[in-house]
C-alpha cells in the first residue's frame, strides 16, 4: 500500500518535469515575418559634431516591422527617433548641446532557438538636428545645424510574456548603449 502511494506522485512529478522542460525548450522566436515591435530606452548618448561638454544622455524609440525571412532570421524595416543631450560644467556652466534625430533602420533578427530571446544587428540612416550654445562674457553664442547621421547597432531582447520584454542595445547609433523595454504589437 505504501509503495503505491509513493509511485503515483513520483510518476506525476516526472511527467510534469518532462512537460515543463519540453515546453521551455520549444523554439519560439519573438520577431517573425509580419510582426510589429516597439522599443524605447535610455542610456549613454553619442556625441555628434564633437561639441558635447560632458557625457551625453541619450534616449531612443523605434518601431520595426518584420518583412522578409532571411535564413534562420528575419529582416525588419522601421523608423527610430531620439536625442542626445549634454550640459556643461566648470568654466562652461552654461554650455549646452543636443541633437534630435529621425532615421530609418533595418536589422536582421535571430532567436537562437531560445524561447523569448531575440538578438539582432542592423544599420540606420537619417537626419540629425544639432544645436549647441554657450555664453562668453556678455555674448550668447548659438549654432544650429542639420546633418546626415548613420549608425550601426547590435542588441538583444528577452520577452518575459508573449508581448512584453526587456531590451539592451549598443553601437554607434543615437545611443552608445541603452536599456529599455520592448512591446510586440502584432
Question: Where in this protein do the model-derived segments appear?
Answer:
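Cleavable N-terminal export/targeting peptides
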Residues: 1-32
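Short glycine-rich loop/turn motifs that provide flexible caps or phosphate-binding loops at active sites
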Residues: 12, 40, 81, 121, ...
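A generic structural signal for short coil/turn motifs at secondary-structure boundaries
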Residues: 47-51, 90, 167-168
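Gram-negative (and chloroplast) outer-membrane scaffold detector with strong preference
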Residues: 46, 57-135, 185
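Outer-envelope beta-barrel architecture signal
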Residues: 30-38, 71-77, 98, 115-121, ...
Amino acid at each position: 500500500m505504501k509503495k503505491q502511494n509513493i509511485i503515483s506522485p513520483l510518476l506525476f512529478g516526472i511527467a510534469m518535469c518532462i512537460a515543463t522542460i519540453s515546453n521551455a525548450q520549444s523554439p519560439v522566436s519573438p520577431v517573425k515575418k509580419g510582426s510589429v515591435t516597439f522599443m524605447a530606452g535610455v542610456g549613454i548618448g553619442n556625441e555628434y559634431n564633437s561639441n558635447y561638454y560632458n557625457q551625453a544622455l541619450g534616449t531612443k524609440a523605434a518601431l520595426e516591422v518584420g518583412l522578409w525571412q532571411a535564413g534562420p532570421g528575419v529582416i525588419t524595416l522601421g523608423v527610430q527617433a531620439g536625442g542626445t543631450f549634454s550640459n556643461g560644467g566648470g568654466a562652461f556652466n552654461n554650455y549646452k548641446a543636443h541633437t534630435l534625430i529621425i532615421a530609418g533602420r533595418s536589422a536582421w533578427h535571430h532567436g537562437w532557438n531560445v524561447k523569448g530571446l531575440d538578438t539582432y544587428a542592423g544599420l540606420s540612416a537619417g537626419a540629425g538636428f544639432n544645436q549647441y550654445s554657450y555664453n562668453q562674457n556678455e555674448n550668447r553664442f548659438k549654432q544650429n545645424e542639420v546633418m546626415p547621421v548613420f549608425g550601426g547597432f547590435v542588441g538583444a531582447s528577452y520577452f518575459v510574456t508573449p508581448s512584453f520584454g526587456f531590451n539592451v542595445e549598443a553601437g554607434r547609433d543615437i545611443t552608445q548603449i541603452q536599456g529599455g523595454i520592448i512591446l510586440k504589437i502584432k
